[in-house]
Amino acid sequence: MAPRGFSCLLLSTSEIDLPVKRRA
């Protein structure tokens, strides 16, 4: 896996996971 792909995926997951945790 390329570092860019991993970083992008991790960042995207964090952005989606953060709001979800805040709502919960």
Curated annotation (Swiss-Prot):
InterPro entries: Humanin. GO terms for cellular component: cytoplasm; extracellular region. One of its GO terms (molecular function) is receptor antagonist activity. It is found in: Secreted; Cytoplasm. It holds the Pfam family Humanin. Highly expressed in the kidney, heart muscle and testis. Not expressed in skeletal muscle. GO terms for biological process: negative regulation of execution phase of apoptosis. Induction: Down-regulated 6 hours following staurosporine (STS) treatment and up-regulated 24 hours following STS treatment. Down-regulated 6 hours following beta-carotene treatment, returning to its basal level 24 hours following beta-carotene treatment. Keywords: Cytoplasm, Secreted. Belongs to the humanin family. Plays a role as a neuroprotective and antiapoptotic factor. This is Humanin-like 8. It comes from Homo sapiens (Human).
